[in-house]
């Protein structure tokens, strides 16, 4: 495994795959993981986890060598495929008829999925989207080092699809010594804007890094969200202090563990700080409001290599006539307009226009147009 801030680079488009016969089919999650492993987004990982690292991550939130890592990055295959594979073999990694990489098989093992669900997602409830996906995927895991032999050609947002080495370069070019990362799978509403701008007061740059991999079906589609980020940045943010680029990973909905994972990945993209808000990467009522912040107390900033910035729940206060949080506003709940991505989605789907205290009008216009289009194509 590489050292903390060294980026792994496992992209080799000249790699000779002509003699490799066997192949493993990748689902969309494994495909996006393959890319992030190869481009260094998941440094220090150099491949899909073998049994030792897998067990260690599930049980201790660390790799076998002690490095912090909180989400198991695994390659599931069916029992039938597993029977045809053996340790030491090189196997092609395929999706949609294209070979995207190879794996040097080091390990083939059957995980205890119930244990993985319980420890990673804190529930075995199949109504939880992460658990549902875990149980739907095949039941044998293949571990081993990978090489990415073909870059994806159909990235939906090519101009915003940058590798960690490119975002690091971009921050350097802009002279940013300190950069705060913000992870989102929702359109940015006023509470997010308030938090981002509060963080921007103490660092050189903001890295807005929306997740555009697989999400649950009622999340707003990535293309609509991207347009909403563009109009927001154009109209309400200083252009030289913000950089927008996509995070092509799938959403795990693993709450606290995913908050650690999101921070580690943003460190690889070049961030020095990472925003952790209310119920980060949560879903439903599976996690406590500030559980994703509390989990960080188990690790030192040195071993994480990135500084988490914790924010209270923010809201619009009708008495203050401004965005605020419980840290800055003395008024009661009756004066607070609570904003959330879920609430915005709900209003829009019911044909209601969120008030300007919720979302900027330009953003609302993009969302309404996008959701109308979605309804037409359904």
Curated annotation (Swiss-Prot):
InterPro entries: ATP-Sase_PUA-like_dom, PUA-like_sf, Rossmann-like_a/b/a_fold, SO4_adenylyltransferase_pro, Sulfurylase_cat_dom, Sulphate_adenylyltransferase. Keywords: ATP-binding, Nucleotide-binding, Nucleotidyltransferase, Transferase. One of its GO terms (molecular function) is ATP binding. Pathway: Sulfur metabolism; hydrogen sulfide biosynthesis; sulfite from sulfate: step 1/3. It catalyses: sulfate + ATP + H(+) = adenosine 5'-phosphosulfate + diphosphate. SUPFAM superfamilies: Nucleotidylyl transferase (SSF52374), PUA domain-like (SSF88697). Belongs to the sulfate adenylyltransferase family. This is Sulfate adenylyltransferase. The gene is sat.
């Amino acid at each position: 495994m590489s050292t903390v801030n060294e980026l792994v680079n496992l992209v080799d488009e000249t790699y000779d795959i002509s003699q490799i016969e066997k192949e493993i089919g990748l689902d969309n999650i494994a495909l996006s993981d393959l890319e992030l492993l190869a481009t260094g987004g998941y440094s220090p990982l150099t491949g899909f986890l073998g049994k030792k690292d897998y067990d260690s991550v599930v049980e201790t939130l660390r790799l076998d060598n002690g490095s912090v890592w909180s989400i198991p990055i695994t390659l599931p295959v069916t029992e039938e495929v597993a029977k045809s594979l053996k340790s030491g073999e090189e196997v092609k990694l395929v999706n949609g008829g294209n070979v995207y990489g190879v794996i040097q098989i080091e390990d083939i093992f059957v995980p205890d999925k119930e244990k993985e669900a319980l420890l990673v997602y804190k529930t075995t409830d199949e109504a939880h989207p992460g658990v549902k996906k875990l149980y739907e995927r095949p039941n044998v895991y293949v571990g081993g080092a990978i090489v990415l032999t073909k870059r994806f050609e159909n990235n939906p947002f090519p101009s915003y699809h940058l590798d960690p080495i490119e975002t690091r370069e971009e921050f350097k070019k802009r002279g940013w010594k300190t950069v705060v990362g913000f992870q989102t799978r929702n359109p940015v509403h006023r509470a997010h804007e308030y938090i981002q701008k509060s963080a921007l007061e103490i660092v050189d740059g903001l890295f807005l890094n929306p997740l555009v991999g697989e999400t649950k079906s009622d999340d707003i589609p990535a293309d609509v969200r991207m347009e909403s980020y563009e109009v927001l940045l154009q109209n309400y943010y200083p252009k030289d202090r913000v950089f927008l680029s996509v995070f092509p990973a799938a959403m795990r909905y693993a709450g606290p563990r995913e908050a650690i994972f999101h921070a580690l990945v943003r460190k690889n993209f070049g961030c020095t700080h990472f925003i952790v808000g209310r119920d980060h990467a949560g879903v439903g009522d599976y996690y406590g409001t500030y559980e994703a912040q509390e989990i960080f107390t188990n690790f030192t900033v040195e071993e994480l290599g990135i500084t988490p910035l914790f924010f209270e729940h923010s809201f619009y206060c009708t008495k203050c006539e401004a965005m605020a949080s419980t840290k800055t506003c003395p008024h009661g709940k009756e004066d607070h307009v609570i904003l959330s991505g879920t609430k915005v989605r709900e209003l829009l789907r019911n044909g209601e226009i969120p008030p300007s205290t919720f979302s900027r009008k330009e953003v609302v216009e993009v969302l309404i147009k996008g959701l109308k289009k979605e309804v037409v194509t359904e």
